[in-house]
Amino acid sequence: MQVLPPSSTGGPSRLFIMRPVATTLLMVAILLAGIIGYRALPVSALPEVDYPTIQVVTLYPGASPDVMTSAVTAPLERQFGQMSGLKQMSSQSSGGASVITLQFQLTLPLDVAEQEVQAAINAATNLLPSDLPNPPVYSKVNPADPPIMTLAVTSTAMPMTQVEDMVETRVAQKISQISGVGLVTLSGGQRPAVRVKLNAQAIAALGLTSETVRTAITGANVNSAKGSLDGPSRAVTLSANDQMQSAEEYRQLIIAYQNGAPIRLGDVATVEQGAENSWLGAWANKEQAIVMNVQRQPGANIISTADSIRQMLPQLTESLPKSVKVTVLSDRTTNIRASVNDTQFELMMAIALVVMIIYLFLRNIPATIIPGVAVPLSLIGTFAVMVFLDFSINNLTLMALTIATGFVVDDAIVVIENISRYIEKGEKPLAAALKGAGEIGFTIISLTFSLIAVLIPLLFMGDIVGRLFREFAITLAVAILISAVVSLTLTPMMCARMLSQESLRKQNRFSRASEKMFDRIIAAYGRGLAKVLNHPWLTLSVALSTLLLSVLLWVFIPKGFFPVQDNGIIQGTLQAPQSSSFANMAQRQRQVADVILQDPAVQSLTSFVGVDGTNPSLNSARLQINLKPLDERDDRVQKVIARLQTAVDKVPGVDLFLQPTQDLTIDTQVSRTQYQFTLQATSLDALSTWVPQLVEKLQQLPQLSDVSSDWQDQGLVAYVNVDRDSASRLGISMADVDNALYNAFGQRLISTIYTQANQYRVVLEHNTENTPGLAALDTIRLTSSDGGVVPLSSIAKIEQRFAPLSINHLDQFPVTTISFNMPDNYSLGDAVQAIMDTEKTLNLPVDITTQFQGSTLAFQSALGSTVWLIVAAVVAMYIVLGILYESFIHPITILSTLPTAGVGALLALLIAGSELDVIAIIGIILLIGIVKKNAIMMIDFALAAEREQGMSPRDAIYQACLLRFRPILMTTLAALLGALPLMLSTGVGAELRRPLGIGMVGGLVVSQVLTLFTTPVIYLLFDRLALWTKSRFARHEEEA
């Protein structure tokens, strides 16, 4: 039995080396747990980091923006403003619609927020208009979040009113019940109704008014309790023909008698089956349709929600007539799956490249198999922990695993290389494994914990960016930790069983040639290192220059927030002159649709015109452009957008604003372009003065493009200026005037038709076909106190004025949003700085405040914390290394490698034309953890040589550099090749992955070249500093 020296006991690895069966079974258990975890993990585009968001919609047909603001929005806002945990409240009040978006703190559960919203709505009920057709309705959805699925329902044989009725009752309700669905909206406005169009001349000739008609209809159509009869032996329920169901029944309704003869509704009005709101329309491509948009709840998994919808659709469509066709126009999960699949492929490529580089260096199949087992085992085992932490398989976690490929192989390489060295010296494999693993154990622990220390600050990042990268950091840390365990257990055990002197010495022609090549490289490195050590101050100046260059590059490199992704869907806003009518806007929309559908990259188009919960005014339209899959089109989304805008510019009288949909949605409202900047004031007058001035200035900036604001104060208003004294003499109140106008022009919902499946409305309005425009006001008649009929024109004058088409609030104060994009040659950082400089030149009054919103605000926050994040990572690593080495000096030597990584990463981003965004910054932080391993391996062996062999510091560090040159080169190339697939990524979602790969590859290349020379020099300089300090202390003690 061989007696091993104490130094060769194997340390923590001994138990696993000596018990191969137990070690193998333990690793099999990790593998099985990881496989089970992988199958159980949900799939998503990004980690679920949505703010809890609730949208409250109140519809009041016929109400002006001013009435909606004062009568509906303001009372609700006052109640919502008292809720705890509310982060931001924004509202939009337009003609007939109030939309309030409530964004809560990340820490507040959505269900709790829902309860608070419902309580606030209940408290505001008594403050809202008594004739509000429906109470406020809330949905757990972020309106700025694009729908996860868009469906178009069309029919060649049925009217759209019947189609919408069937979709609403048979399809939309069922989809709404699916877990994860936050809101199902039907765009197209074809809800069935009975429309009563009064003939103003006919009722005037008969001495009637619209109020007489309204009262007659509401009194004739009721549906209330009537009681029952309870006799000695039988109980009888009472019922009556109090409901009118069809247009024909309403035509026959008697509304008055004159000279004993009945006047029926059909005599004074056109009564027909129609749509509840005739100023709404939706189209799928060029065909009128009911468009169904499905939005998810904040925090819901998009893939599982879409899968549930897909599974239910065949069953739902079977319940519809054959002539009704349901088409899935867009499904965001298609691109998400493609992006995740591409990332998984890049992960497999990284593993293959890493194994290839191992074989290139070790030139031995058994030695290659060992890390070839360790790498996938470490990665697969990570899935088990991810399930326990409620993570998902998404682009960021897969990117973490791809990067981890280069990390986790480091530990195995270091162990194998050290054990192989002892076997080549003649040691038995078992003894070599015990000795090599024991010797390298501390290095593995140092590498692991110092690398994890770099990730710790990521866990404490605040707000949504911190939530976003928490899964990334923890996934990477778990993979690194499992890798360390595998490298100290399975790897030395396999080395003891699979490696031998014969296998290591067995060489073919390739092995001999590559060995000679490596020997020449090491010899050349040794000669270069000797020269460098003879000129330490020159080398130190190079190191300081890299630090200075890093700072300069950091200042001047273009900065961004989050890469703009190509998800194959473009959201658009079409803007026409502010006085445009529904019919005019619908015509313009069809012209634009024709142009867009001619583009070869466009697959389908949905568009919507009218005022509802998403569209604020009649002069705007919403579009969703669905592009062909990436492999079926030649251009990326930004080029398609530029091409479409150029084509639509030829359509007169419209402006088209386009932006690609993104997986990360921070905004709370649908804006015209990608980025937002707000002006908030205490009054609308202040905004009307300063918004046009600021917009004009911003439109002149070269750093901005597509600058526009949602401030529209030139909407035409017919102001009815009532002579109150004259009206009072006639016994006419302002309520009478409002009612008469509402009856005539408000599409007033005056009664409800109840059926077993749904409820439908009776809509009252004037027939204005023969009296268009302001002339229609001359037909209004009111009833005086003596029963006479009085023309409105006798007590009022009509004035044409201008007023806002919508009134927006942010946290209860008036606000306007300025939207903008950037040209290709400018970054978000350039745009933000230009806006801030322009704002200063305007000298805005103190009652106007400005703030960036959405992703621009998040960019500012992330940019402000980035430097502190990097400093925190460096400090955390210094603390860990100081504890491990029991030294204040050696951690500084190790950390001196960091500027070289920064220079390499920033130069690579600059050359590639990539911005320094959040993804790239994460790459730089990871580089901090990677590049210091070169110094750790050098310093560990140098300290051991000084301590055990009595070498001088210069000889020790020189020998350590030559001994560790091969594993340093091997591990660096492994990390580089692990990041290379990300850098070369071209598939779906490549925009998200590429900055990480570019930064890491650039940083690794530069740091590999420089740290091999700068680290030994800095090690010796600090060693001399330590000796000088000790001698100074010793001299002071002697003198004392």
From Swiss-Prot:
Keyword field contains Cell inner membrane: yes
Gene induction: The mdtABC operon is transcriptionally activated by BaeR.
Keywords, sorted A to Z: Cell inner membrane, Cell membrane, Membrane, Transmembrane, Transmembrane helix, Transport
Gene Ontology molecular function, alphabetical: xenobiotic transmembrane transporter activity
Keyword Ubl conjugation attached: no
Membrane-spanning ranges: 16-36, 347-367, 369-389, 396-416, 440-460, 472-492, 537-557, 863-883, 888-908, 911-931, 968-988, 998-1018
GO cellular component: plasma membrane
Localization, UniProt: Cell inner membrane
Predominant cellular place of this UniProt entry's protein: membrane
Membrane topology note: Multi-pass membrane protein
One Pfam family matching this protein: ACR_tran
Domain of life: Bacteria
Similarity annotation: Belongs to the resistance-nodulation-cell division (RND) (TC 2.A.6) family. MdtB subfamily.
Function: The MdtABC tripartite complex confers resistance against novobiocin and deoxycholate.
Subunit composition and interactions: Part of a tripartite efflux system composed of MdtA, MdtB and MdtC. MdtB forms a heteromultimer with MdtC.
Name under which the protein is recorded: Multidrug resistance protein MdtB
Organism: Escherichia fergusonii (strain ATCC 35469 / DSM 13698 / CCUG 18766 / IAM 14443 / JCM 21226 / LMG 7866 / NBRC 102419 / NCTC 12128 / CDC 0568-73)
Gene coding for it: mdtB
